[in-house]
Amino acid sequence: MKADQVAALKKSFEQIETVGQQAGHYFYNSLLERNPSFKAMFTGDMDLQVEKFLSTLKLMVHSFESSKNGEYHLSADLRLPLKNLGKKHQELGVNSEMYKPVAEALVGSLEKFSGDAFTPELRKAWTDAYWEIADAMKTHQ
């Protein structure tokens, strides 16, 4: 990712944070409506799940570091926790094919709550960030 993409993610997340609970519930409702088989994985308190989701999203946008070539990548310090998170997700029944519907629900939710600010460039930044996180989570497999 480039510096302008990381800056755009941070600015976008600030906007999303103002409607965090609403956006988080929209994300999960969208995900579960499109993928009913996922519902069995979400048996707990959805308000708590939304809080975890928003915390993870915030951590994500603030965890990209510049490398020598000017590209931004996930902080090396975050890779092991993400690997462990991926392992926990796998133990809950998440497989590699499930990451794509999550990406679609995430980007769709971000678009809904960003309005006109959700440009094609911002879509690409969020998509790239998501897949870097997802790929780190899948390294345990």
Question: How should each PLM-predicted stretch be described?
Answer:
Residues 1-141:
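Globin-like tetrapyrrole-binding proteins
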